[in-house]
């Protein structure tokens, strides 16, 4: 296994470095994938997708609850100023969210505001400023595991597959009745999110809770869950393919999906 920090270190020092991985052939990239892995991806084509379906997900055993301290609510403040370009982009993205049913119009007495962050490619990412809400929210007691302890469980394994399920946040629902608490306001309208949003405190912990609940019989046997990553580890390729199948089957059972580009195919090393 090679950590991201190790890679950054050797690159900064100008050291010659070689990294090997098994990936899929696509768009003129030379890659290798075993027939067995390709068969699994074909079998679970409704779990590993090029892009996630933009529809409201079903409720799971664990939804994201938002509990506020009694008598407290976020302080009201004036909306952020937006340029004409930002305002047009906001209207566009809100329309897309309405079309997917990720949000719905709201009359809730909350006024959390929208702002924009510029991406590396120059496009705009719409964000909701939940900082004031997070300050009055009762904290989830779930403890994020120490990554060093997770690595201890992987020491005998020789094959690894990593599923990056960050996009899974949009596949988790806000607990019924709590949607109004994350209402965002714009110049003209108010909307409440029906799915878990990235800026909410302990959103990663909620996702970990769901994954640990779903994969209870597999955790510490051949998978570890860390934030929005699932790492499948095995001592042989035969075992690894079987473990991979079991994980994909569980994800299919709960109607949870991953983007294909977020999948690190079976290899003898991976990046956390």
PLM region spans:
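Retroelement reverse transcriptase polymerase core
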Residues: 2-272
């Amino acid at each position: 296994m090679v950590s991201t920090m190790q890679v950054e270190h050797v690159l900064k020092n100008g050291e010659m470095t070689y990294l090997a991985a098994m990936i899929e052939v696509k768009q003129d990239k030379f890659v290798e994938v075993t027939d067995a892995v390709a068969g699994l991806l074909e079998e679970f084509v409704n779990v590993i997708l090029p892009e996630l379906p933009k529809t409201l997900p079903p409720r799971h055993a664990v939804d994201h609850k938002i509990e506020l301290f009694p008598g407290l609510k976020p302080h009201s403040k004036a909306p952020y100023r937006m340029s004409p370009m930002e305002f047009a982009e906001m209207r566009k993205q809100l329309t897309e969210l309405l079309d997917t049913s990720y949000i719905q119009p709201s009359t809730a007495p909350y006024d959390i505001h929208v702002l924009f962050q510029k991406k590396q490619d120059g496009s705009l990412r719409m964000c909701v400023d939940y900082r004031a809400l997070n300050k009055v929210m009762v904290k989830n007691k779930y403890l994020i595991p120490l990554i060093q302890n997770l690595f201890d469980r992987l020491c005998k394994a020789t094959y690894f597959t990593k599923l990056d399920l960050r996009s899974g946040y949009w596949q988790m629902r806000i607990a019924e009745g709590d949607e109004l608490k994350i209402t965002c306001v714009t110049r003209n309208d108010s909307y409440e999110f029906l799915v878990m949003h990235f800026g909410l405190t302990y959103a990663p912990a909620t996702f970990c809770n769901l994954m640990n609940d779903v994969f209870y019989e597999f955790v510490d046997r051949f998978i570890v869950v860390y934030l929005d990553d699932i790492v499948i580890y095995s001592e042989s390729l035969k075992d690894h393919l079987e473990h991979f199948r079991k994980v994909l089957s569980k994800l299919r059972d709960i109607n949870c999906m991953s983007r294909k580009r977020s999948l690190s195919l079976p290899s003898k090393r991976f990046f956390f």
